[in-house]
Amino acid sequence: NHNFTTASPNLYSDMVGESVAFKKVTNIIERVKDNKATIIITGESGTGKELVARAIHYSGKFSREPFIAVNCGAIPENLQEAELFGYIKGAFTGANENRNGFFQAAKGGTLFLDEIGTASLAVQTKLLRALQEKEITRVGSQKVEKVDIRIIAATNANLKDEIKNGSFREDLYYRLTVVEINVPPLRERKSDISILADKFIRKYGIEFKDRLLRIAPEALQILERYNWPGNIRELENIIQRAVIMSDGIIKVKDLPEALKYQIDFPDNGLRPLYEMEKEYIQRVLVHTKGNKTKAAQILQIDRKTLREKLK
C-alpha cells in the first residue's frame, strides 16, 4: 500500500498535477478524507480512479485501517456474493469452512469497489442493505453482522444508462452518489502532461536504467499535442517504452509512430470536409518539412491524389 502524504493540497504521492481540472478533484478529496460518506468516482478507463480512492483513504484519519480494492468485473458473477460478503461452511459445494469476504477484511477502513456497474443484481441488493442498515449476512447464513466501513465505488460506465436497461438499481445509485468525483480525462488536463511524464521518466529511469533520464522538448511537444484516448495509463506505458528505447534523452524517435502524426483540431464549429482535409494535409506537410512523398505515405494516399487534394 502506498503511503499518501499531504505535503501540499495538490500532491498525493502517486497523484500529481497543477491543472484546474486536477485541483477540482483534490479539493473534493480534502473535504471527504476524514469522514465515511459514500463516494462514487467516475471517469474514463485509465484516468486513475483507484489512485483517487487511495488518496482519500491514505491522506485521512482512517489511513491506519485497511484499504481493500476489489475489481467487481474480475469476479465471476456466481462468486461475487461469496467473495464480497463471505460464506459459512456448507453454504455451497466446496465451502468446507467459514470464510471472510472483502467486507470483513475492510473492517474499520475503506472498501473500494471498482467497475461497480458489473455487480450482479443480488450483490447490488446486499450492497444497498449494507449502506442503509450498516449490516450484511454471509452466504448461507441468516446471522446479521454489523459493518463499519467506508465504501468508495468507481465506474467508467454511465450508470444512468444501466438503470434504464434494468441492470443497475436506481435506489443503489442514489445511495452511492452521496459524493461524486469525476476524474477528468488527460486531454482535459494537458498542462499536467509534462509533470506526469517527468514522474514516469523518474520511475522507469531508475527501474530500467538505474539513472535519471530527461525528455527532449520536441518529444514533450508531441506528448502534449496527442489526444490520449487511454489516458494516464497510456502515457505511463509510452514513457516506459521510451525509457527502454532511449539512450539517456527521450527523443521523438523513441515515441510510437501513432503519436507523431495525430493532430488535434480545435472545435470551432462544423466545416466542409474538404476544408478540414486540406488543413490536415497542410499540417502533415509542415510536419514533413514539405516532403510530399513522406506526407503521402503518412496519409496513405499516392502523390497524384495528394496533388489533387491540394488544388
Question: Predicted segment positions?
Answer:
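Conserved RecA-like P-loop NTPase ATPase core
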Residues: 25, 47, 70, 84, ...
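Short gly/ser/thr-rich secondary-structure transition/capping motifs
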Residues: 90-97, 133-138
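Bacterial C-terminal helix-turn-helix
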Residues: 237, 266-311
